[in-house]
A protein has these predicted regions:
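Bacterial Sec-dependent N-terminal signal peptides
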Residues: 1-23
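Proline-enriched interdomain boundary motifs that mark the N-terminal boundary
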Residues: 272-285
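A short beta-strand segment in extracellular, disulfide-stabilized domains
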Residues: 287-302
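Solvent-exposed loop segments of extracellular immunoglobulin-like
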Residues: 300-313
Length: 334
């Protein structure tokens, strides 16, 4: 009996860590992928959502929704943009990803962005997701990771590329947010790598490398990519009530070999819709949009009680009534 229980426990443990992501290309429209999956906020939404991928050129589709239960992959769900067939991103890491044909073009804005960093690229098989939005707060951020077949084999000298191009429509100024933290380097297998998986070159920003999914780790990989970065954060400070455009683009370098992908986490795409307070949440449908107000009520009689309100432990001068109208996030008490 003890042996049977042990075998059962090992089976359950193995299955827990070998779950692959699920990719869905049919349940969401392009606009729904952005507004319902990435942003998911009643406060602000994206407009003019457009995509471009291989299926526009007689090749494979590189855009889809994914879900995950594998603890080795740090996202539960989100949107995937791939330089190959997005459905082939499903793990385990068992096959080489070389999808796409010669009719699927690259992206000139990605090439121009890399050129500004001294990187020459002849791109192909580009997948693009872009939209307009007008923020109501200065905060812009989202969580993502980069995965690629090039990790291990080609991480020393050859890399696909991607960019998150944020443009202030009024000024025309564009900033690439897909950079290695605390640097100006575009993220790729060359700029984030660990020499343990290819000793031909030293590590580069290895603290941001997440996992190598080859060799003994292949069978338990959530995706079919050789490696991936850690969960990273793209962020910027915006001017409220100013129109912006964001272009998310990824492409193969030179040919369709060794595909790569960007995974963007659900509900993390903050395009300036900050809510008021942690307990007033989008998830509970109680969110208060930035710039709006909310009234805290004690339901106590002012004839029987005196009131002193605090914000973050500090007494608020003049706040002595039974109710308090607030416009800023914080921890309030009475």
């Amino acid at each position: 009996m003890k042996k049977v229980i042990l075998i059962l426990a090992l089976t359950i443990f193995t299955n827990c860590f070998s779950q692959a992501i699920k990719v869905d290309t049919n349940s969401y429209s392009t606009t729904q992928l952005v507004n319902s999956v990435l942003i998911n906020s009643p406060c602000v939404s994206a407009t003019n959502v457009t995509t471009r991928t291989g299926s526009n050129f007689g090749s494979v589709n590189g855009i889809g929704f994914f879900q995950n239960t594998n603890p080795r992959f740090p996202m539960k769900s989100g949107v995937i943009l791939s330089t190959g067939n997005v459905t082939n991103a499903v793990g385990p890491n068992a096959t080489e990803l070389n999808d796409g044909n010669a009719s699927w073009p690259g992206d000139s804005s990605l090439e121009s962005t890399l050129a500004q960093s001294g990187i020459t690229m002849n791109s192909t098989n580009a997948t693009v997701l872009e939209f307009d939005f007008t923020p109501i707060s200065p905060t812009f951020s989202f969580e993502f990771l980069f995965a690629s077949e090039e990790y291990g084999n080609f991480q020393c000298q050859f890399s696909d590329a991607f960019a998150f191009l944020l443009t202030n429509v009024n000024t025309g100024v564009t900033t690439n947010l897909a950079i290695v933290p605390n640097t100006t380097l575009p993220i790729s297998v060359v700029t984030i790598r660990d020499y343990l998986y290819n000793s031909s070159c030293p590590s580069a920003n290895a603290e941001y490398f997440g996992s190598y999914n080859g060799d003994s780790a292949a069978a338990g990989s959530a995706t079919n990519f050789n490696g991936q970065t850690k969960l990273l954060n793209a962020f910027a400070t915006l001017i409220p009530n100013t129109p912006y455009h964001i272009k998310l683009v990824i492409a193969d370098r030179s040919d369709s070999g060794s595909d790569s992908a960007i995974f963007i986490a659900s509900d993390t795409f903050n395009i300036g819709q900050d809510v008021l307070g942690q307990d007033l949440t989008v998830a509970n449908n109680t969110a208060v949009c930035f710039g709006s107000s909310h009234t805290l009520t004690t339901n106590l009689s002012p004839t029987e009680y005196t009131f002193k309100w605090t914000k973050d432990g500090v007494i608020i001068p003049g706040a002595t009534s039974e109710n308090l109208t607030i416009t800023k996030a914080g921890k309030y008490g009475v």
